[in-house]
A protein has these predicted regions:
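Long, ordered, helix-rich scaffold segments
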Residues: 351, 382, 465, 478-480, ...
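Surface-exposed beta-strand/loop patches in extracellular or lumenal glycoproteins
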Residues: 42-59, 139, 148-154, 423, ...
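Hydrophobic helix-coil surface modules that form long, contiguous segments used
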Residues: 39, 126-129, 137-299, 328-331, ...
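Beta-strand-rich binding/interaction modules
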Residues: 61-68, 437-438, 450-531
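N-terminal, polar/Ser/Thr-rich
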Residues: 1-38, 115-121, 141, 438-442
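A surface-exposed beta-strand-loop module
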Residues: 53, 57-115, 136-139, 512-524
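Hydrophobic alpha-helical and helix-loop surface patches within well-folded domains
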Residues: 70, 179, 215-479, 603, ...
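Glycine/proline-rich low-complexity spacer/linker segments in large multi-domain proteins
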Residues: 8-16, 97-148, 195-200, 534-560, ...
Length: 854
């Protein structure tokens, strides 16, 4: 039974039968209550006469189905989310009327009631296969069509879709919106957003002289925090940059950006109607890192309007190309067209995600085999985004920037409003550059894993370099040695105590060894850095002298990107057991006071948290945790008044507080009996402090209720749920565990908040959670039977007891995980993959704890 799945073979067969989908006409009725909505679909399509195929619809109540004027029995032909279509004509008309169901998981048509004012909001999220939860479809990207949408909504609601929003017609107590027909597009990038959204409008002139209407919207209760001017400015800069880079005008008629609640992703590139999670509407003062991340997301989705929406992959095996391209282009635009000129440092931070994913036992080639929709879901990861984008950056260097964009222009022009493949793109790039990309594609795109680069320095008696070579080895099994375009540089301290670059060479590194000619004969620098400028995608090692220098002189590296590469190399060595966790903590805590790039500071603080939580040896953990909390609190107190760093360090100190003295200091900040000059103790920061206090037994239910009463919002209630789950007590943890596993009415964001609170004491009293190892594996099969894929995936990951690995002698998380896999060979590929990855995380933790123990 297919269930919700679709195989590539089925999609290929259906596309061979359906020669074209002429048009969709869709009517939705959103006035029928809070559980169901009306859905009528009329599809005109051409097919091979006499053949049979199927359409897709997820609905528990199909009222009528008509094919070419003949009524079909819904009970007979609508089975397993498919509508059987037999004995097709050359020209066909399918009409389906159904009641579809609102979702609360961010899939299909999501419905949300704002606790701040009781207003209801809806929005769609269709990637990968969820348009079929809203209307009848041929749910695959290569069966493109036009869409004409009519929506009946409660009076006062605004409705947005891919075409411009028309003036509504009154119909009793409802408004009816009749949208114009869209451009040709795939079903997964169609959109419906409806509710009492409020916002700001503007216009811009496209490169072909058209006026493009812009809109930025959010819920009424948070619209006061919507800094639309900043968002519109980034959007204008992105339009100008992308139209210039692609040589093609914006391909749709308008551009709305709508910030929506309880989103299960960051954003979605629906054509001309982009949705974002409304955590990007900052209700308190954002850090520079948060502003840059939002700008990058805005540009990422805008880049998709050409690459992904105008030209779309034929099948999901090229999803990586879609996302990697947008990831690369957004950072390029960020650095070259906006005020966020250090955008490539943020790119380096994102690369951390890809490198981690690439070292898991489930790593896959960038061009992974996607046999069905289940494969899409499990391969939508750091390789799809971060590694792919890094490899595209290498490709730009390999073929040359001018040739890259010339080839890209030809690709987008030839396949406009149609579908294409990776081979189509590579052929255009090869033609534009004159380079044969077959061998490059094989080692970079068709093989999994990562290689490791290491400097080997031979020094003469007089201190000069006789030979500097970069060796390359296949760190991952099966990975070939790859060509890399990157910089290698040397740095030394000056007499004034500053750090100066004494040589740099940008070159192609290929094969097992590459000699750096620029270094020959010069005095050995204090520090040698492979991948200076972060052009490459590889694991990079520091030689022994350079590592020692970095530990003692990290504050001397004034360029954020250089500093970031140094810190990334040190962290990678820590993860691989070549640098004890406590040594990394010493380096990182020395780097924090001088870190002026907030994206890099965010990453460093995240790595500090991870090192203390998982890599420090059990016998040293209490001491290391207390020392880390103390030093972070001191750094917070000495940070620049009112700075982003001050705010981030206060939050980090609270997360890492362990001693009575530290909790007393956090409590004094929370109560206002002690203050830090310039620190704005806003409601978001107060929640972070309060959750930490609850974790340490320094705050109560009364404190939670008092703060929640002042923050009667979605975010406030989610934070309160996290705080309540963070309370100590066996019955409290048992209640949280039961609710997140059984109560399907809980919104996912609230569920994730509760789980974060559940594990609050895992670092200080891990043995208290020992019983949940068995309970987790007993519940695992039921999770995948009860919840949708996205929810099941997150539950499986967030409830996994990796926090106990190595720290609770009476349980063996690794052995339990392996035993579960052995006993459940018939489990879904997605489930098995996640458990294998989490077992690997635990094995790495235990190995690194042994290294740290000495």
């Amino acid at each position: 039974m297919p269930g919700l799945n679709l195989t590539r073979e089925e999609a290929t067969e259906r596309a061979s039968i359906i020669s074209s989908v002429t048009r969709y006409e869709i009517s939705l009725d959103l006035t029928r209550g809070d559980t169901d909505f009306g859905s009528f679909t009329r599809i005109e399509f051409d097919a091979r006469e006499g053949a049979s195929t199927f359409a897709d619809l997820v609905s528990n109540n199909v009222h009528s189905i008509t094919l070419n004027g003949n009524a079909l029995d819904p009970f007979s032909v609508h089975q397993d989310n498919r509508i059987a279509l037999e004995n097709l004509a050359e020209h066909n008309v399918l009409e389906v009327e159904a009641s579809c169901q609102y979702m609360h998981t961010g899939e299909g048509l999501h419905r949300f009631v704002d606790p701040a004012d009781g207003q209801a909001y809806t929005y769609s999220q269709f990637e990968v296969p969820d348009a079929r939860r809203v209307y009848t479809t041929f749910e695959q990207p290569d069966l493109k069509s036009t869409f004409t949408l009519t929506v009946k909504a409660p009076k006062g609601w605004k409705v947005f879709s891919n075409a411009p929003t028309p003036t509504p017609e009154e119909e009793g107590e409802a408004w009816v919106y009749r949208f114009a027909t869209t451009e040709v597009m795939s079903t997964y990038i169609t959109a419906i957003v409806a509710g009492p959204y409020e916002g700001t409008t503007a216009t811009l002139t496209s490169s072909d002289g058209r006026t493009i209407d812009l809109g930025v919207y959010a819920r009424a209760s948070i619209v006061e925090h919507l800094d639309a001017d900043e968002i519109i400015e980034i959007t204008r800069q992105g339009f100008e940059f992308f139209e210039g880079a692609y040589g093609i005008a914006y391909p749709f008629t308008k551009y709305d950006q709508i910030f929506v609640p309880e989103y299960n992703a960051g954003a979605m590139e629906d054509a001309g109607c982009v949705t974002f999670r409304d955590a990007y509407v900052f209700r308190t003062r954002p850090t520079e890192a948060q502003m840059e991340a939002r700008a990058n997301t805005i540009l990422h989705e805008l880049a998709h309007m050409w690459f992904g929406d105008l030209v779309t992959m034929k099948w999901w095996n090229d999803l990586w190309l879609n996302e990697s391209f947008a990831e690369f282009m957004s950072h390029l635009a960020l650095a070259e067209a906006t005020k966020y000129t250090e955008g490539w440092t943020g790119f380096m931070v994102r690369k951390d995600w890809g490198l981690k994913q690439d070292q898991l036992p489930t790593t896959h080639p960038i061009t992974a085999e996607i046999r069905d929709l289940a494969d899409v879901e499990v391969n939508f990861d750091g390789i799809t985004y971060a590694k792919g984008a890094s490899v595209l950056r290498q490709l730009v260097s390999y073929v040359g920037r001018d040739a890259f964009f010339a080839g890209l222009h030809e690709y987008l022009t030839k396949h406009s409003y149609a579908n294409a493949t990776l081979d189509d793109l590579l052929s255009e790039l090869a033609a534009a550059s004159g380079r044969d990309l077959a061998s490059w594609s094989k080692v970079w795109l068709e093989e999994a894993g990562v290689t490791l680069l290491r400097p080997v320095i031979t020094t003469a008696e007089d201190g000069t370099i006789e030979r500097l070579e970069i060796t390359q080895e296949a760190f991952s099994e099966g990975a070939s040695l790859r060509p890399h375009r990157m910089g290698v540089a040397g740095y030394s301290l000056t007499e004034e105590g500053t750090l100066a670059q004494v040589f740099r060479e940008e070159l192609d590194i290929d094969g097992a060894s590459t000699v750096i000619e620029a270094a020959a004969g010069i005095t050995r620098p204090d520090f040698i850095l492979v991948n200076d400028g972060d052009l490459g995608y590889a694991k990079v090692r520091l030689d022994e002298q350079s590592l020692a220098f970095a530990i003692n002189n990290i504050t001397k590296f004034t360029d954020s990107l250089t500093r970031g590469v140094v810190m990334a190399s040190a962290w990678d060595m820590t993860r691989d057991g070549e640098m004890p966790a406590r040594d990394y903590l010493n380096l990182a805590l020395r780097a924090v006071p001088v870190e002026d790039n907030m994206s890099l500071l965010t990453l460093t603080l995240r790595h500090i948290d991870e090192a203390v939580r998982t890599f420090v040896a059990p016998k040293y953990r209490a001491e290391a945790a207390e020392d880390t909390g103390r030093r972070l609190l001191l750094l917070a107190r000495t940070a620049a008044s009112g700075s982003d760093a001050q705010r981030m360090l206060v939050a980090a100190a609270a997360r890492n507080a362990t001693s009575l003295e530290q909790f007393e200091a956090i409590r004094a900040l929370y109560d206002g009996t002690q203050t830090l000059d310039g620190l704005d103790l806003d409601v978001d920061l107060k929640w972070g402090l309060l959750i930490a206090l609850v974790r340490g037994g320094a705050a109560t239910e009364e404190d939670i209720a008092a703060l929640e009463a002042t923050d009667d919002t979605m975010t406030g209630h989610q934070n309160a749920a996290a705080a309540r789950a963070a309370r100590e007590g066996e019955w409290i943890k048992a209640d949280v565990w039961d609710k997140v596993l059984t109560d399907t009415s809980i919104p996912n964001d609230t569920r994730w908040a509760m789980i974060s609170g559940f594990w609050a004491q895992a670092r200080t009293t891990p043995s208290a959670y020992a019983g949940y190892v068995g309970e987790y594996f007993e519940a695992l099969a039921g999770i995948w039977e009860t919840f949708t894929f996205h929810t099941a995936e997150d539950l499986t990951t967030l409830l996994f007891p990796n926090a106990l690995a190595g720290y609770v002698p009476e349980v063996d998380v690794v052995a339990s995980g392996k035993a579960w896999i052995e006993a459940h060979a018939d489990a879904s590929a997605g489930t098995i993959r996640i458990i294998r990855e989490l077992i690997d995380v635990c094995e790495r933790q235990i190995a690194n704890q042994a290294v740290d123990a000495g």
